[in-house]
Structure formats: C-alpha cells, structure tokens
Amino acid sequence: MLAIPFRGNGGERERVLEKTLELLRNLYNWEHIELFDSNHPVFNRSASRNRGVFAAVQYGCDVVVVCDADSIPEKEPLWAAIHAAHDGLIHFPFTSVAEYPADRIHELDSTLSAARTLGTGWYPSQGGCWVATPKAWWEAGGMDERIIHWGPEDRAFLAAYRTLLGDSVKHEGMLVCVSHGDRGRQFDPADVRIMEQYEHAFGNRDKMLKVIASRGPVR
C-alpha cells in the first residue's frame, strides 16, 4: 500500500501532488494508493502518516510505503525496499535527496533523469519516504502526533526506531523532493521540545518506551 499524507491549499501543492501521483503510480503494482489527512485544525503530518499505516492494517497489507506528497523515489530501490521490509526494520528507498524546482516538475518522467541535472541541494535524509511492515512501524511507536509541523517528527521517529528496532536500511538511490513555496524550514519550538525527549532517550530502550507511553493529547 502507498499512503500519502496530504492537505491541499488550493495552490501549488495540488499541482505538485498531481504530478507526484502520476509518477508514483508507475513505480509499483500497488494494491492501494490513498491520501490521508487526520483532519486536525492544523495539518498534522505525524497523525496523517499514522492513519495511513492504520489503513494498511485494515486492508491486510504486509508492507506499507509512507511517502510525502512532494517526494518521488526511484523504481529499483523502491522495489528492493518493499521486498526487504519483512526483516522488521525501517527501510528507505534512497541514499540521497535531490531538491527539484516545482516550476520544472512537468519535465520529470519515470526515469527521474531531469532531477540529475536540475536537482540541487543534494543531501542524505531519513524522512520523506519510509518502507516498513505495519508491525515494525508500531513497534517503533509510530509517529508522535503531538509534533504537528514539518521536521522534528522525522527526527523523533528516527531516534525511536533506531533505539527500539535497530538502524534503518538504506537502498542506494535518489529521492526527488519537489521544492514549493509553502514548504517551511523553521522548526516549531514546541515540536522541538518534544523531539528532544526522544533524542535524550536515544539508545536506552526503557527510557524510549517511557517517552512513547507518556505521550499526551495532540495540541
């Protein structure tokens, strides 16, 4: 199953999503492709991703790909990650991220070759596209839905799954991340404070489980 967290704003995000979906559909023989919005007053990426994994359980899917609406992996590493995910770890179908300009998205095809020449800001990442069994996702605690905005939720989840499951598995390849105007770069201070709880518990299973168990209501 392919689960995509998404809330539109009537602008550029819809155009990016349309092209992203076109490309993602051709990457794998998906049984289900769905968009998820937890319907919190402020779009909650963590909760929306968790809803996608809940749906995968309901559908009886053995593996779920949770992919952001502006992100596109390459076909070969995606297939490799899906077929390897039964090891109970978190998999990433890429080893580097290429930022791609939204105004050139029409030039992308299934090979993603345009991103190799137009992509900028190449960097490693452990977010954007996760591949896992639903069981592994929940054994790592799922994403903390108290972290509402972009950025700290990935880092908190990283600390949790590395502590509770082990290091992630990265499959050689590129993730194209489409840059768009409403994609913020400033972390919310309240989100950062929650993220730091996970970072302080990193490497200590008992402490990490306590952090997860102590989660309060969504703000």
Q: Where on the chain are the PLM-derived regions?
A:
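Ligand-binding pocket scaffold of soluble enzyme catalytic domains
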Residues: 35-39, 75
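Active-site nucleotide-sugar/metal-binding loop of Leloir-type enzymes
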Residues: 47-63
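C-terminal catalytic/acceptor-binding lobe
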Residues: 146-219
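Conserved catalytic core of nucleotide-sugar-dependent glycosyltransferases
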Residues: 74-146
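Hydrophobic targeting segments
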Residues: 1-5, 24, 31-35
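A short, glycine-/small-residue-rich helix N-cap motif at loop->alpha-helix starts
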Residues: 40-47, 53, 149-151
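Short beta-strand-to-loop acidic/aromatic patch adjacent to the donor-nucleotide binding site
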Residues: 61-72
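Short, acidic, metal-binding catalytic loop of nucleotide-sugar glycosyltransferases
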Residues: 9, 14-31
